């Protein structure tokens, strides 16, 4: 029921240009997500309260700033609108609340938080973009990559990975590139595969992989998904990054280099996750024809690659 309300709120936002409608849909979105977080554990109640307080504060800031901007058209209020949305997205330096609630989130609620819940704030950023925020987006992407290296909980690593990818998406939005929609969709498909596998394997910490017996098919799918998220060729994540670089070529060269460096750092902590997988059931070859034939993620990668080539070439 709640997921349908969230979907409707997103569809209404897609068809609106009014800041008031955006604000109203964000509130509906927030109130619909809170019951999804609830699994009747004390940790979850604390997380729900934290989420509610942060989202209420950012929504209030957005409402007041938008109202004042519509009256006085001052740059200060325009910047505050952007800041309020960045708080909702959990971009650095406003990411602390995401880390606080991450441990108590279920994999299902984490998936929604990292994908669907970002759509309305990103639509608002597209309407109220301040180009002065671009350096913040880029530094947020870099810092998220660096900070992820000290964490060992998979949910926290995925959150920092999401923040890093958000930096790319926000830069695409800042440059008025509609490719950000495709980037978000491809990222959502990849992260869906990873989170579903983590849930099936009950994978919460990096050390868990060395203690669990994992089926070859599941291991293979996880490796493919992580390599795609890392942007390794020939997976769809690589072409996603290449297309983003192509569209951002006109941006400041230093900024572009920082984004690429952040992706290379991301590759390091993705490899931290992948390394144990390569040594589980080592007799299994991930490139064997039978396993490739049955592997869902390979089919998805091939399909998305064909679609991407047809769209852009």
Curated annotation (Swiss-Prot):
Q: Does the keyword Translocase apply?
A: yes
Name the chemical reaction catalysed here: a ubiquinone + NADH + 5 H(+)(in) = a ubiquinol + NAD(+) + 4 H(+)(out)
Membrane topology reported for the UniProt record: Multi-pass membrane protein
Q: Which GO terms describe its biological process?
A: mitochondrial electron transport, NADH to ubiquinone
The record's annotation in InterPro entries points to:
Complex_I_Subunit_2, NADH_UbQ_OxRdtase_chain2, ND/Mrp_TM
What are the entry keywords? Electron transport, Membrane, Mitochondrion, Mitochondrion inner membrane, NAD, Respiratory chain, Translocase, Transmembrane, Transmembrane helix, Transport, Ubiquinone
Q: Where in the cell is it found?
A: Mitochondrion inner membrane
Q: What is its main location?
A: mitochondrion
Instruction: Please state the Enzyme Commission number of this protein.
Output: 7.1.1.2
One Gene Ontology CC term in the entry:
mitochondrial inner membrane
Transmembrane segment boundaries? 3-23, 47-67, 81-101, 105-125, 128-148, 153-173, 177-197, 220-240, 253-275, 293-313
User: In its keyword annotation, does this UniProt entry include Metal-binding?
Assistant: no
Molecular function terms in GO for this entry? Answer: NADH dehydrogenase (ubiquinone) activity
Purpose of the protein: Core subunit of the mitochondrial membrane respiratory chain NADH dehydrogenase (Complex I) that is believed to belong to the minimal assembly required for catalysis. Complex I functions in the transfer of electrons from NADH to the respiratory chain. The immediate electron acceptor for the enzyme is believed to be ubiquinone.
Record-stated family: Belongs to the complex I subunit 2 family.
Protein name per the record: NADH-ubiquinone oxidoreductase chain 2
């Amino acid at each position: 029921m709640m997921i349908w309300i969230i979907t409707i709120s997103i569809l209404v936002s897609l068809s609106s240009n009014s800041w008031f409608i955006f604000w109203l849909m964000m509130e509906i979105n927030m109130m619909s997500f809170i019951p999804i977080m609830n699994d009747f554990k004390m940790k979850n109640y604390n997380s729900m309260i934290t989420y509610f307080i942060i989202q209420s504060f950012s929504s209030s800031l957005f409402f007041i700033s938008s109202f004042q901007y519509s009256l006085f058209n001052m740059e200060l209020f325009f910047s505050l609108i952007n800041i309020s949305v960045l708080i909702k997205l959990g971009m650095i330096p406003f990411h602390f609340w995401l880390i606080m609630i991450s441990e108590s989130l279920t994999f299902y609620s984490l998936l929604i938080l990292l994908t669907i819940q970002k759509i309305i704030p990103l639509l608002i950023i597209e309407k109220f973009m301040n180009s002065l925020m671009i350096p913040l987006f880029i530094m947020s992407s870099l810092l998220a990559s660096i900070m992820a290296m000290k964490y060992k909980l998979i949910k926290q690593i995925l959150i920092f990975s999401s923040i890093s990818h958000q930096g790319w998406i926000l830069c695409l939005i800042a440059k008025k590139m509609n490719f950000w929609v495709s980037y978000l969709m491809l990222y959502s498909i990849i992260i869906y595969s990873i989170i579903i596998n983590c849930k099936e394997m009950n994978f919460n910490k990096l050390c868990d992989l060395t203690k669990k017996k994992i089926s070859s098919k599941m291991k293979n799918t996880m490796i493919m998904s992580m390599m795609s998220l890392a942007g390794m060729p020939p997976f769809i994540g690589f072409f996603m990054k290449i297309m983003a670089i192509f569209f951002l070529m006109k941006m400041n060269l230093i900024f572009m280099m920082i984004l690429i460096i952040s992706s290379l750092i991301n590759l390091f902590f993705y490899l931290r996750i992948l390394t144990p997988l390569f040594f589980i059931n080592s007799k299994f070859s991930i490139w064997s024809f039978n396993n490739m034939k049955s592997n869902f993620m390979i089919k998805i990668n091939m399909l998305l690659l064909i679609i991407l080539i047809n769209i852009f070439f």
